[in-house]
Amino acid sequence: MDYRKYHAGYGTESTFADMLRDKSVSEGDIKSWQSGLPDFATEKADVRAKLVEWQTSWMKDYGVDYFRVDTVKHVDSTTWAALKNSTTEVNPSFKMIGEYYGAGYASNGSTLGTGQMDADLDFDFNDQATSFVSGNISSVESFLSSRNAALNNAYMTGQFLSSHDEDGFKASLM
């Protein structure tokens, strides 16, 4: 399941008023409204607990067995660890792959190997794939060897080529 944990969606301020951050406060990636969307105050224990309860109920009610987590850097690490702990209580093999924009195997926003995410999307892979089809096979092989040496069962990446947020992989080849 693809989801965002940090905001409630446009037009939902009155529904979730007691769970949202103050719109006038702007404190970096975690404590600011992003793109004008009402932001859950995930650093508050009661808000965190309610969100985790909702998300684990999706697992129980609908058989969700993994989350592809959007915009990981907009939620505090305590919340990610709480969600991961709760999901593995329901299903020990539950997995979460995070989208931490700009992350790669060498720079992942400290979400891997910390009990938060099982994997992050590897944004460096896009450049490597472009380099590969451009004929730079040796440099890509070197990158992949280094990346593979760094990965293990608690520190994994998923190949990332493009998304709705940027030009597609094929566009970079034209």
Tell what function each PLM region has.
Residues 1-62, 82-98, 106-107, 130-131:
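Substrate-binding/active-site clefts of carbohydrate-active enzymes
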Residues 53-162, 166, 170-174:
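Active-site-proximal helices and loops of the catalytic beta/alpha 8
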